[in-house]
Regions:
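A short hydrophobic beta-strand element
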Residues: 102-111
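Hydrophobic/aromatic beta-strand elements that line small-molecule binding cavities or substrate pockets
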Residues: 93-98, 111-112, 123-128
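A short, polar/proline- and glycine-enriched secondary-structure boundary/capping micro-motif
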Residues: 68, 117-120, 147-152
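Hydrophobic pocket/interface hotspot
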Residues: 32-35, 45-47, 54, 74-75, ...
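Beta-strand elements of well-folded, non-transmembrane domains
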Residues: 113-115, 132
Protein backbone atom coordinates (compact mmCIF):
# COMPACT_ATOMS: atom_id res chain seq x y z
CA UNK A 1 0.00 0.00 0.00
CA UNK A 2 2.81 2.39 0.92
CA UNK A 3 4.45 1.55 -2.41
CA UNK A 4 1.32 2.58 -4.34
CA UNK A 5 0.98 5.73 -2.26
CA UNK A 6 4.59 6.66 -3.14
CA UNK A 7 3.91 6.11 -6.85
CA UNK A 8 0.77 8.28 -6.69
CA UNK A 9 2.64 11.07 -4.91
CA UNK A 10 5.44 10.92 -7.50
CA UNK A 11 2.96 11.09 -10.39
CA UNK A 12 1.13 13.98 -8.72
CA UNK A 13 4.35 15.97 -8.18
CA UNK A 14 5.53 15.50 -11.78
CA UNK A 15 2.12 16.36 -13.22
CA UNK A 16 2.02 19.59 -11.21
CA UNK A 17 5.44 20.55 -12.57
CA UNK A 18 4.57 19.84 -16.21
CA UNK A 19 4.85 22.97 -18.36
CA UNK A 20 1.50 24.51 -19.13
CA UNK A 21 0.56 24.31 -22.80
CA UNK A 22 -1.13 27.34 -24.26
CA UNK A 23 -4.58 26.86 -25.67
CA UNK A 24 -5.23 27.53 -29.34
CA UNK A 25 -7.03 30.72 -28.30
CA UNK A 26 -3.96 31.94 -26.37
CA UNK A 27 -1.64 31.04 -29.25
CA UNK A 28 -3.85 32.99 -31.66
CA UNK A 29 -3.74 36.04 -29.40
CA UNK A 30 0.06 35.86 -29.07
CA UNK A 31 0.43 35.53 -32.85
CA UNK A 32 -1.86 38.49 -33.56
CA UNK A 33 -0.09 40.71 -31.03
CA UNK A 34 3.30 39.64 -32.39
CA UNK A 35 2.18 40.61 -35.90
CA UNK A 36 1.15 44.10 -34.74
CA UNK A 37 4.36 44.51 -32.71
CA UNK A 38 6.55 43.61 -35.70
CA UNK A 39 4.87 45.07 -38.82
CA UNK A 40 7.21 48.07 -38.95
CA UNK A 41 10.24 47.06 -36.86
CA UNK A 42 10.63 43.47 -38.08
CA UNK A 43 8.52 42.95 -41.22
CA UNK A 44 10.06 39.54 -42.01
CA UNK A 45 8.95 38.25 -38.60
CA UNK A 46 5.45 39.67 -39.15
CA UNK A 47 5.29 38.23 -42.67
CA UNK A 48 6.27 34.77 -41.38
CA UNK A 49 3.04 34.69 -39.35
CA UNK A 50 0.84 35.04 -42.45
CA UNK A 51 -0.95 32.28 -44.36
CA UNK A 52 -0.09 31.94 -48.08
CA UNK A 53 -3.66 33.08 -48.94
CA UNK A 54 -3.55 36.03 -46.50
CA UNK A 55 -5.66 39.16 -47.07
CA UNK A 56 -5.76 42.55 -45.34
CA UNK A 57 -8.25 45.38 -45.71
CA UNK A 58 -8.81 48.68 -43.98
CA UNK A 59 -12.59 48.87 -43.71
CA UNK A 60 -12.99 52.61 -44.24
CA UNK A 61 -15.13 54.16 -46.96
CA UNK A 62 -12.64 56.72 -48.31
CA UNK A 63 -9.28 56.30 -50.13
CA UNK A 64 -7.78 52.83 -49.72
CA UNK A 65 -10.96 51.64 -47.98
CA UNK A 66 -11.98 48.09 -48.80
CA UNK A 67 -8.96 47.46 -51.01
CA UNK A 68 -7.69 43.91 -50.52
CA UNK A 69 -3.96 43.57 -49.89
CA UNK A 70 -2.04 40.28 -49.97
CA UNK A 71 1.02 38.97 -48.16
CA UNK A 72 3.44 40.60 -50.61
CA UNK A 73 1.98 44.00 -51.48
CA UNK A 74 0.95 44.70 -47.87
CA UNK A 75 4.62 45.02 -46.95
CA UNK A 76 6.09 46.11 -50.31
CA UNK A 77 3.57 48.89 -50.93
CA UNK A 78 1.14 49.59 -48.06
CA UNK A 79 3.54 49.60 -45.08
CA UNK A 80 6.53 50.79 -47.13
CA UNK A 81 4.92 53.65 -49.10
CA UNK A 82 1.35 54.53 -48.09
CA UNK A 83 1.66 54.48 -44.29
CA UNK A 84 4.91 56.53 -44.15
CA UNK A 85 3.34 59.12 -46.47
CA UNK A 86 0.30 59.70 -44.24
CA UNK A 87 2.07 59.08 -40.90
CA UNK A 88 5.54 60.52 -41.55
CA UNK A 89 6.57 60.33 -37.87
CA UNK A 90 5.14 56.86 -37.32
CA UNK A 91 2.57 55.82 -34.75
CA UNK A 92 2.60 54.34 -31.27
CA UNK A 93 -0.14 51.77 -30.72
CA UNK A 94 -1.20 50.73 -27.23
CA UNK A 95 -3.26 47.57 -26.77
CA UNK A 96 -6.26 48.23 -24.52
CA UNK A 97 -8.08 44.91 -24.73
CA UNK A 98 -8.29 41.70 -26.72
CA UNK A 99 -10.72 38.85 -27.32
CA UNK A 100 -9.66 35.52 -28.76
CA UNK A 101 -10.97 32.07 -29.53
CA UNK A 102 -9.86 29.06 -31.56
CA UNK A 103 -10.75 30.79 -34.86
CA UNK A 104 -9.52 34.33 -34.42
CA UNK A 105 -8.71 37.42 -32.40
CA UNK A 106 -9.95 40.99 -31.99
CA UNK A 107 -7.44 43.49 -30.60
CA UNK A 108 -8.52 46.96 -29.47
CA UNK A 109 -5.82 49.63 -29.61
CA UNK A 110 -5.35 53.35 -29.17
CA UNK A 111 -2.96 55.21 -31.42
CA UNK A 112 -0.78 58.22 -30.70
CA UNK A 113 0.52 59.99 -33.79
CA UNK A 114 0.72 63.15 -35.82
CA UNK A 115 -0.65 62.64 -39.31
CA UNK A 116 0.45 64.67 -42.29
CA UNK A 117 -2.38 67.13 -41.49
CA UNK A 118 -2.24 67.26 -37.69
CA UNK A 119 -2.91 65.32 -34.51
CA UNK A 120 -4.08 61.78 -35.22
CA UNK A 121 -5.01 59.79 -32.11
CA UNK A 122 -7.36 57.17 -33.50
CA UNK A 123 -8.90 54.07 -31.92
CA UNK A 124 -8.49 50.72 -33.68
CA UNK A 125 -10.03 47.28 -33.77
CA UNK A 126 -8.05 44.63 -35.64
CA UNK A 127 -10.00 41.47 -36.48
CA UNK A 128 -7.79 38.46 -37.19
CA UNK A 129 -9.01 35.17 -38.67
CA UNK A 130 -6.72 32.16 -38.41
CA UNK A 131 -6.21 29.17 -40.70
CA UNK A 132 -3.68 26.31 -40.53
CA UNK A 133 -2.00 27.89 -37.49
CA UNK A 134 -1.33 31.19 -39.30
CA UNK A 135 -3.05 34.55 -39.77
CA UNK A 136 -5.41 34.15 -42.73
CA UNK A 137 -7.00 37.61 -42.76
CA UNK A 138 -6.97 40.95 -40.96
CA UNK A 139 -9.62 43.64 -41.10
CA UNK A 140 -8.80 47.05 -39.61
CA UNK A 141 -11.56 49.30 -38.26
CA UNK A 142 -11.13 52.90 -37.06
CA UNK A 143 -12.64 56.38 -37.41
CA UNK A 144 -13.11 57.40 -41.05
CA UNK A 145 -13.48 61.03 -39.99
CA UNK A 146 -10.03 61.15 -38.42
CA UNK A 147 -8.47 59.32 -41.36
CA UNK A 148 -10.19 61.66 -43.83
CA UNK A 149 -9.32 64.93 -42.08
CA UNK A 150 -5.94 64.25 -40.49
CA UNK A 151 -4.39 61.94 -43.07
CA UNK A 152 -6.03 62.85 -46.39
CA UNK A 153 -6.93 66.53 -45.74
CA UNK A 154 -10.66 66.18 -46.42
CA UNK A 155 -12.79 69.06 -45.16
CA UNK A 156 -16.00 68.49 -43.24
CA UNK A 157 -18.90 70.53 -44.57
CA UNK A 158 -22.12 71.21 -42.71
CA UNK A 159 -24.92 70.41 -45.17
CA UNK A 160 -27.73 71.54 -42.85
CA UNK A 161 -29.02 75.07 -43.43
Amino acid sequence: MIKYFGILITIFVFSCNAPKKNSLSENNLEMAQSFLDNIITNPEKAKSLLHKDFTFAWMGIIEQGGKIWNKENLFDEYFKNIIPEILPNGIVLKTLDAISDDNGVAIIQEGDAVGKNGEYDNKYVWVFKMKDGLIHSIREYNSDILVATQLYNYKLINTEK
